[in-house]
Amino acid sequence: MHLIIPDSYDPKLSVKDTQRAIRYIRETFQDEFGAQLNLSRLSAPMFVEKSTGLNDNLNGIEQPVSFTMQDMGDSQIEIVHSLAKWKRVALKRYGFNLHEGLYTNMNAIRKDEDLDNFHSAYVDQWDWEKVITKEERTLDTLKQTVRQIFKVIKHMEHEVWYKFPEAVHHLPDKIHFITTQELEDRFPDLTPRERENAITKELGCVFLMQIGGALKSGKRHDGRAPDYDDWQLNGDILFWYEPLKQAIEISSMGIRVDAESMQRQLKIADAEDRLSLPYHQMVLHEEVPFTIGGGIGQSRLCMLLLGKAHVGEVQAALWPQAMIDQCEAANIHLL
């Protein structure tokens, strides 16, 4: 557990008005986001069978919540960490065409999450995925899509200002692009998290690219599962968040692996045993479309747009009593 208490925190909205604002942001954003990227809303599962290989393994150390079901025999069922792989299969299953895509309201439990102002065991995000061609698996495609997403987020600042002018947190006008290697070259003596804070404070908003593989130092900037993002074609959208004087990650996204990049990354991750799983076989034999996709944090977006000090102000979850007490003493009202 780690908690940042901002100086003299004064929430601009009551708990009741905050709830109204959350609903407005969620409903407005998903409509504009879907229209901008040509995405249709789909219903999505809260749990999948472990044997399918569809769950997100995150960094490889987080354990999903699992259980059995009365009518499913000995099959292990897992609550999703995310829908990164499920979405790609869904695009095939439901017959989406080139440059069409889907988004879902994804709810997940990450029981091993380190809790702080930004991180909760309960994850709510818009998980999205879009069909592209093999030739479009490029940095240009990635950057163009990032700019589209940034455009919608920036427009949401104005939408929120119209409805809740006293609460809106102002966002930068431009997003900048930088790779993890460029960041390490520039700030070799800082930790990865410190580098993110330094560059985001300087530029306001950045898309940090190429996360997952080893840098020249031999270290990774951060971990990424080896079987959905191509580590050379992915990244995080980060905003400088002045209320907490830190960078806040709003989205993790990327162009998805093809057979070659998946095999290479699974070998690096010492996880080649996954190649026999149904999802991985579909990627190997090009039985699922080439795609780009990611997740956009719903609660984090609300937190960013409303200038909140803790994600627990915009979502109902469980927190240690010590964190609850410290927040109450600092005028931070957790739901």
Swiss-Prot record:
Keywords: Amino-acid biosynthesis, Asparagine biosynthesis, ATP-binding, Cytoplasm, Ligase, Nucleotide-binding. It catalyses: L-aspartate + NH4(+) + ATP = L-asparagine + AMP + diphosphate + H(+). It holds the Pfam family AsnA. It comes from the Bacteria. Pathway: Amino-acid biosynthesis; L-asparagine biosynthesis; L-asparagine from L-aspartate (ammonia route): step 1/1. CDD domains: AsnA. One of its GO terms (biological process) is L-asparagine biosynthetic process. It is found in: Cytoplasm. GO terms for cellular component: cytosol. Belongs to the class-II aminoacyl-tRNA synthetase family. AsnA subfamily. This is Aspartate--ammonia ligase. It comes from Levilactobacillus brevis (strain ATCC 367 / BCRC 12310 / CIP 105137 / JCM 1170 / LMG 11437 / NCIMB 947 / NCTC 947).
